[in-house]
Each structure stands twice: as structure tokens, then as C-alpha cells.
Amino acid sequence: MEADFAVELGPQDETLELPWSAGEEGPRYYDLKRQPELLLEIEEARAWPELGEFLAAVNASPNLLETAKCDAWATSEINPEEEIFGAACKFGSYVDLLFSPWASRFSFMEHEQLVKRITQLLKRVPEIPAAAELIIRRCFYHATGGVEDGFYLTFYLFGYGDDEAQARQRWGIALKLVENAIRQIAAGVNA
């Protein structure tokens, strides 16, 4: 599996407001760490069970992370750097990840250590036509006392194949490998 990380903290880069909402009737933030039953409210988790399993695992109590947002999709648009997979199709997803410990959300060093550790573990997994990228971004945490400027991670994952079914299957396998890497890191932190 290809695995890499990046830092995007410029003024034009993506940010996250937490909690977030797309309007009264639209999608919104659900605190799955503290209310796991709300997983049933997330359309993407219902549409793609593999993503639902990943969200449940990441938000499980002993884990050091929790999720804020997600999506998944299939496309036949292959970027030049993805041509190495020799695929006609890709299935992709993103999940926005937050540290569960409040203080860790404001530590760039902890975010950087985490993305380095995850990418190191993923580079050791068996060869699979998949690519993961973790991006450190700015998050604005809205709390009772105002807004605090911190960080979060966007985790992109793509599986590649000759058709959508094969690409999705490879994406699902890669998603389990990432889940296992996060569990290993969490086990080391909680030991």
C-alpha cells in the first residue's frame, strides 16, 4: 500500500469547524465516541458497511481517536500519479479524525507523530493496489468559552481495480489495514 502524509495549514487550505452542520435538515456532526448508537444516522455508514465498521472501530472507547466527518465514492478518473496501479477505476473515501484527549487536539507535534507512525505501519503491509494519505489541517473547536484553534487529520484512502467492484473490495481491505494500524498505535498509547 502506498502511504504518505502532508501538512496543509495555509490560509487557503481546508479547515474544519467542530461541531459542524450542513443546515437544519442536512448532514451534521455526530459524537460517535460518546454516542455510538448515532452511527445509524450517518448515511455513508449505511451505504458502505465497510466505512461504518471503520467508524465504529475508530470511535471505540479505548481508541485515542474519534471521527468528525466522512464520505466515500467511486470514479474512473485516475490521476497521473495513480497510473502505477494500472487500474481503470478507483473507490475512495475520506474520514476526518480528531484526537480524543482534548489537549492533544492542540498539539501539532502529536499530530505529526501520529501520521508518521500510521504511514510507517502502512508501508509494511502486504502489497495491495491502494493508497492512503493523511493530512494535518487546522480545526476550530467551538466550546462553551469560545473558539480554540487546533488541528485534525483528514485520512484519504483509495482502492484501485479493473471495475468498481474490484476497486471497492481493495478499498475495503485497505480500510481494515488502516484500522489495524490505528488499533496498534492506540494499544501502545494505552498500555
Predicted segment positions?
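Compositionally biased, low-structure terminal segments
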Residues: 6, 30-31, 100, 107-109
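Short, ordered beta-strand-loop transition motifs
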Residues: 73, 84-91, 140-151
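Short, structured coil/loop segments at alpha-helix boundaries
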Residues: 41-55, 101-111, 163-164
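Generic intrinsically disordered, low-complexity segments enriched for polar/acidic and small residues
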Residues: 2, 26-27, 96, 137-138, ...
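Short, flexible beta-strand-to-coil junctions
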Residues: 72-73, 98-103, 158-162
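N-terminal low-complexity, intrinsically disordered segments
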Residues: 1-90
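Ampiphathic alpha-helical segments that act as solvent-exposed interaction surfaces
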Residues: 107-142, 147-191
